[in-house]
Amino acid sequence: MRCIWLAVLALLPSAAPAQNVCRPSELVTRFGDWKALSIPIRLSAPSQDITPKTRDGQLAASMRLLIAAPNPGAKPWSLAIRDRDGHLLSQLERSDFPSASSTLWTGRLTGSMVTVTLRGGDADTFVEVRGASASGPPNSDQNGFSISGATAQWRDFYTGAPHSHAPAPPNRRDPAEAVGIFVDDTLAPAAAGPPGTRTSWCCTGVMIGRNLYLTNWHCAGPKRLWDGEVRGNAVIDLAWENGPIRRQFSVSEVVAQNEDLDFAILRIQPAAGADGGVRTTFPVQISTAPISPGQSIYMIHHAQCQPKLISDNCHVQSASRAAWTDPLGGAGAKTEITHDCDTEPGASGAPIFDPQGRLIALHHLGHQKAASPMCPIDNVNKAVKMSAISDFIRASVDPKYQALVVELGW
């Protein structure tokens, strides 16, 4: 399955001179294949089956649908989305489409087929499924981009597969429940295909407040810009783990961001149609204490867009590394650490925890496989210290950042 792709960074717009930034090729991780659709749903034909396939012809393991209501009509209605067996997966309401130009993405819908049914409305009501992002089974190929040995030593958080078959210890469940996959679908650059082509990707992130999600700045995707399109098409799934509970969110606001520290803090809200499966999130604890080389750590992530994984029995290698935008350390600030937790594309934004389950760093870069004058080859993974992120936000005079300091108790 080809749910992962490695972007050629030379083809992407850059927010900083490429020669001054160490950015390996794993920054953008493909997740799902876009299929343009034009499926009308009216009272005269209120129910339609949707069966998108991946680029290589596989049936989808899950999908997201892009839905519009060009004419919502005058009467209330709802749109029920059910799986092959008739289980209700999501329900959208007329109020989710405030205007005829409104479109929205559903959350992740499991299964190879869904049925979309219009309930209510009037003769003028016209809803349209405009596209689907179809994802095949999770990719478990061992690509070997940023791992220490011949095979990755991460394992499924809940089952322990494929290595030890021992689940993670119970005291790590609370931190794990705050970790989720970030998935986005936006219009692709013109060079990527015909008009209307979309591109999708995944990252990892973690809840640091009741409705605040922390991930990497570069997880804004190919445009490297947290604009309205990226925000509007994103979904965050805190239960991408084959579990029974749906915990999916959309992004309402980018509260804080910084390229040098490669972080973005997103304010989130329950995704349309997903309210019934969402409860208040329980954020992680954060530690800004000094980090020491050799310190024991673990990382929870979605490498290769797989269900929730854990990389443990790993350690901090260096506690003093310059920022990715200052690879030679000219600015003097040592805002990053290096570590040996196995990672792959999709783990960008993954939280790194100390043995007490406190968030100490945010993973953002893997091994530097290709050398450049500014960036020599290395075999270390990199993460941004939470102390650096906290210091940056607390030092800002921006009223929005000062309000964030109060909200987070920093």
Q: Which residue ranges define each predicted feature?
A:
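Sec-dependent signal peptide recognition
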Residues: 1-7
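N-terminal signal peptide c-region/cleavage motif recognized by signal peptidases
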Residues: 13-15
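Domain-level representation of secreted and single-pass membrane ectodomains enriched
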Residues: 19-172, 177-180, 248-252, 392, ...
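Generic structural signal for well-ordered beta-strand positions
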Residues: 89, 214, 360-361
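Serine endopeptidase catalytic core focused on the charge-relay Asp
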Residues: 110, 120, 130-194, 198-200, ...
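Short, small/polar residue-rich loop motifs at catalytic or cofactor-binding pockets
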Residues: 199-202, 344-348
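C-terminal subregion of chymotrypsin/trypsin-like serine protease catalytic domains
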Residues: 208-209, 256-258, 326-334, 344, ...
